Every structure is written in C-alpha cells, then in structure tokens.
Amino acid sequence: MHDLVAARPYRSRDEEGNVRVVAEIDGSQPLWFSVSSDDEELLGGRADHVAVALLLPAMRHARDLRVGGVVTDSLLHRLNHDLQSLVRTVHPSYHSVVVTADETAPAGDAPSGVATGFSGGVDSFATLTEYASAAGVPRALRVTHLLNNNVGAHGGGGRALWRKRFDALRPVAADLGLPFIPVDSNIEEHYPQMGFMQTVTFRNAAVVHLLGGGIGRSYHASEGTYRNVRMPPTHGDIGLAGAMTFPLLSTPALTVESTSSGMSRIERTLALVGGPYARYLDVCIDADPDRTTNCSRCWKCMRTMLTLEIAGSLDEFVPGVFIRAPYERRRTQYYAELLSSSEPNDIELVEFGSRNGWRWGAIARGRATARRAKHWAREVARALR
C-alpha cells in the first residue's frame, strides 16, 4: 500500500477566529487541531504532533509514514522502534512501518508550562488535587494549564457534548485560577473503527506535542494503582500501559508522564467526598449532549455510585450528580458483572465491598457463576480453533 504522507503543518483561522494547525494528507482529509487565538502562544513550530497522531493509523493499514516539517530526532527514533513494539504487543494485527520526516532536529529547551487534561472524571480530579490544589508542590511540577481535548471521547455526542462538558467545568478552573484551554481536532476521523480506549494514549499525547511552544510537562491520569499497571489484553485499553508508553512519547523538551498510580480508583473516588468540587464530577459515557446529570446506569456511573454507596457517601451526590432510580434498577445485574470480572479495578471494588460487609446477594452470585462459565467456554472454543 502507498505511503501515508502528511505535509508540513500550517496555521489558519476558522470561522470563529480560532487558530487551526493543519497538515494536509495525500488522498485523505487534512488532520487539524485548533485553539483559541488567546492560546496561540502555546503552539509549537514542529510536526511532532502529526507524527504521534498518525503513527497508529499508519501501522494499522501497513503504510509507511512520511511527515512534512521538522520532527524532534529522539521522538522519531522511538516512533520507529520501541513504541511500535509496544503497540504491536497490544494490537498484533498492526504492522511495522517506517516513519520519516522532511527534517529532524534535537529538542530545544523545555518550556516552563505544566499541563494536565481535565474532564471532570475521578482520575483527572486526582491529578488536579495532587499537582494543582495541594500545598507544597514544587514549582517545576505544579500545574499551570488545564486542557480539555476533543479527540474522540464523546461518542455520538461529538463536538456539542464536548463543549457542554467543557463549559460545565469552567468554574473549577476559575476557582483554581488556572487557564482552561479547549483543544478541538478532527483526529477521530483519522481513526476509523480503531476504538477510542485502544488508541487514547496517542490521541492525547498528540495534543501536548501540539502545545510544545509553551508546555514542557504533561500529566495524564493513570487508570489504576501501580499493582494494576500491565500490558493490556489483545486489542484492549492501551491506557493500562500508560506508565510504559508515556516515557516513550516524551522528548528532552517535553516530559509526558502518567500520574496518580499511588492511589487506587476507590481512594480517588472517596477523596472527592466532602470536597468543594464534588458537584462537578462527570464520569458518564452517555453521549447525549442534553443530559444534565450522569446517566447513573452506564458501567462508569455504576462503578462510581457503588463505591460511594459502600462507603456510605452516595447521598452526598444524589440527586445533583447522580440519580438513584436507574442505578437501583441495574444494581443486581451490575453485581453479577463485577463478581465475574477479571478487570483489576473491578476486583478491587469487590474486595472493598467484601471488607465492608457488603451483601452481593444470591441472585447476583448465581448470575456471576453463569457468566464465568460462559466466558470459560468461549476461551476453550477459541483455543481449539
């Protein structure tokens, strides 16, 4: 198959006056990212973000990647070596490719800006607490900018849901006295049928490389505690390997790192109880842009609500953040899913409940046994093929 060729990025203005960084793609639609004109000073002049953004599409379709403009030499080296090995461990059907650039250059000096993504979820609040609102954080580590990226996490709700979620979180940023930067993009259109969780690390890393003119350190909340850091299952959530992936996506001018692995998901959730920002918690995966609360029935809502209920703190979040009725209707089925799960965060939640005398019920245990048997049968059948 022919190479995936991206031209040197250039800047333009969209109809709202935002600054759009565009890389034309041979035979395809351009790749673009945009920020407000007030944030233009953060934009870097290199094409590192293009190389990071397009590596996975190139590997999936077995197309060597040619990037116009300047790419940092150390990043280009890792894109051709260890990063591809890591990606192919998670996605064995992806191919080794050659990544080249029109020009390479050593990294310059690291800018002083420190950014973290802020979505209003449990994990992003944990990072915010540790590196923005806590006392005694060294200046070199203290967050100076909050980011909210539109890189495909909002499902069918798309740009409308992204904007609504961003606007809802503005008061938190204002209270902390931090600039809150929305970064729009069409990167999702370059990842057809590739899955968001399967590619999330590279999507968000592309954004911080885009902002390399002002950001020299970027935090990305881990998905669990250190004991759960591991290579994901085949075609699984690549974010589970964040502690391994992010260092390979760094350069001497930009440190990209995974944070908050010292806390379990349960500890991060309970840290919000009684806090000033609890009412802003948004964990929901429902893509309806018109929703006014968390849906209280998706797996993320169920996990968070059960954690709070076991701790005796759910009432603090109802009805402003969650709604009790949908949760209670689905609770027994969710218990069965938890009890039969091998996912580390689910196992931790079951252990937390059992330590606190939580009663799962005979019906849920029976359904869990049936689910495990069905899963075992599928695995045996797959092994015999």
Region spans (language model):
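Nucleotide-activated chemistry modules centered on ATP-dependent adenylation/adenylyltransferase
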Residues: 1-9, 14-24, 53, 58-65, ...
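Extended acidic/polar, glycine-enriched regions
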Residues: 40-55
